[in-house]
Amino acid sequence: MTMCVSIGHGDQRVIQAIIDQAQELPYAAPGMATRARAMLGKKLSEILPAGLTRYLYTLGGADANENAIKLARGYTGKFKVLSRYRSYHGATFGAISVTGDPRRVVWEPAVMPGVVHFLDPYRYRSTFHRNNPDISDEEFCQDYLNHLEEIIQYEGPDTIAAILVESVTGTNGVIVPPDGYLP
């Protein structure tokens, strides 16, 4: 089994926060109002752009991704979701469907329809530049952005509800995209 914990392992501050929360309120259903959610909502309103005033609290990452897909499809009326290969978005039905690593293969062809994967800009295993490791970051990045643009055109821009991207791929190698890949 593999896992990725972006906050580290054994951090005493995290452990203490878990203990404190368990002593105050060990469980809350997604729709329940709690002090922790109120504090998080206040913090989000301080750091997010103006106008983003509603938040959907979920139980975890896979649940958040599933809800994001439902919201994107419902809001746009479009169906397709694009996601990178080597990504990991969770193990629930929808989340494993958008996951781009081989863990999803055992569930195919029963995965959620409408998912399209595209290549990620990973220098170590670059599809486009295996024989040219000295290519500039700018050109390397642009080739992968061009690839994504081509996928969008082939799939039909008017059919795409969302593009789901990890800012840094975690469980599949801590893959940091090159500068310029993400805005």
What are the language-model segments listed below?
Residues 32, 135, 139, 172-176:
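Alpha-helix capping and helix-loop boundary segments enriched in small/acidic/polar residues
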Residues 2-3, 24-25, 122-125, 167-171:
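A short, flexible beta-alpha/helix-coil linker loop
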Residues 42-161, 180:
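PLP-dependent aspartate aminotransferase-fold enzymes
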Residues 164-180:
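Conserved PLP phosphate-binding loop immediately N-terminal to the Schiff-base lysine helix
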Residues 2-31, 41-56:
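Glycine-rich phosphate-binding segment of PLP-dependent enzymes
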Residues 32-35, 59-60:
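Short beta->alpha linker loops
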